[in-house]
From Swiss-Prot:
The modification Cysteine methyl ester is found at residue 296. Residues 16-27 have a biased composition (Acidic residues). Keywords: Acetylation, Cytoplasm, Host-virus interaction, Lipoprotein, Membrane, Methylation, Peroxisome, Peroxisome biogenesis, Peroxisome biogenesis disorder, Phosphoprotein, Prenylation, Zellweger syndrome. GO terms for cellular component: brush border membrane; cytoplasm; cytosol; membrane; nucleoplasm; nucleus; peroxisomal membrane; peroxisome. One of its GO terms (biological process) is negative regulation of lipid binding. It is found in: Cytoplasm; Peroxisome membrane. This is Peroxisomal biogenesis factor 19. The lineage of its organism: Eukaryota, Metazoa, Chordata, Craniata, Vertebrata.
């Protein structure tokens, strides 16, 4: 009888130990669960009816989501969250001032993702690119023409975390990385190269029909485009930082010259919206090696 009671006691103890082990495992599992997504900061519409979304709101939402993934690939989770928050703050402030520009960034990003070898997708991307760059050029002009003092401008830049210091709020390198992703050399360079290759024949066939002054402008435009292509083609993976910086400054200077010469012929570059400048000032462009500059004949 005593042996039976002892056996029951041992069995009960084993059951308790098994139960405690299972509970501990469940606790560990609960701790390992990912934290729930933070609640959306978007204000819900009130009972009076749906709220009208301002221009660019949809573009902001999609852009924030895509950039959060971009930051997470660059940093660990804590830094990614911080970078995302800084980027979102800067873009929200930009969207309040220039909602159309934010919307164009999203259109450009979507078009870049769809661009392929077919003419339709390339024309769509080119159109979005031109509109976005036009907005950037307008913003730069407005800033130059504004009456802000140097001190006010410095404070504004610090508020966006884009000052030149090395503080934690400096988001300028991140914004530059975003621009490089949106305006990749693999997408932009082939289109520019194609125009330069078609330009000589176009100039030859329109020599007699164009006013001399306009013809000379087109000749100069072709020459500048070829110089830009040569800069792209001179890039190598072993270039030093000094060489890359010098090439970048040269490209920006050439792009400004290109803008001053006006629009390229629509037969070569496609239709352009009225009043739109062929402005590529703010881009950090570099071209892939391999394409020969010999086809760019300076006329």
């Amino acid at each position: 009888m005593a042996a039976a009671e002892e056996g029951c006691s041992v069995g009960a103890e084993a059951d308790r130990e098994l139960e405690e082990l299972l509970e501990s495992a469940l606790d560990d599992f609960d701790k390992a669960k990912p934290s729930p997504a933070p609640p959306s900061t978007t204000t819900a519409p009130d009972a009076s009816g749906p709220q009208k979304r301002s221009p660019g709101d949809t573009a902001k939402d999609a852009l924030f989501a895509s950039q959060e993934k971009f930051f997470q690939e660059l940093f660990d989770s804590e830094l990614a969250s911080q970078a995302t928050a800084e980027f979102e703050k800067a873009m929200k402030e930009l969207a309040e001032e220039e909602p159309h520009l934010v919307e164009q960034f999203q259109k450009l990003s979507e078009a870049a993702g769809r661009v392929g070898s077919d003419m339709t997708s390339q024309q769509e991307f080119t159109s979005c690119l031109k509109e976005t760059l036009s907005g950037l050029a307008k913003n730069a002009t407005d800033l130059q023409n504004s009456s802000m003092s140097e001190e006010e401008l410095t404070k504004a830049m610090e508020g966006l975390g884009m000052d030149e210091g090395d503080g934690e709020g400096n988001i300028l390198p991140i914004m530059q990385s975003i621009m490089q992703n949106l305006l990749s050399k693999d997408v932009l360079y082939p289109s520019l190269k194609e125009i330069t290759e078609k330009y000589p024949e176009w100039l030859q066939s329109h020599r007699e029909s164009l006013p001399p002054e306009q013809f000379e402008k087109y000749q100069e435009q072709h020459s500048v485009m070829c110089k830009i292509c040569e800069q792209f083609e001179a890039e190598t993976p072993t270039d030093s930082e000094t060489t890359q910086k010098a090439r970048f400054e040269m490209v920006l200077d050439l792009m400004q010259q290109l803008q001053d010469l006006g629009h390229p012929p629509k037969e070569l570059a496609g239709e352009m919206p009225p009043g739109l400048n062929f402005d590529l000032d703010a881009l950090n462009l570099s071209g892939p090696p391999g394409a020969s500059g010999e086809q760019c004949l300076i006329m």
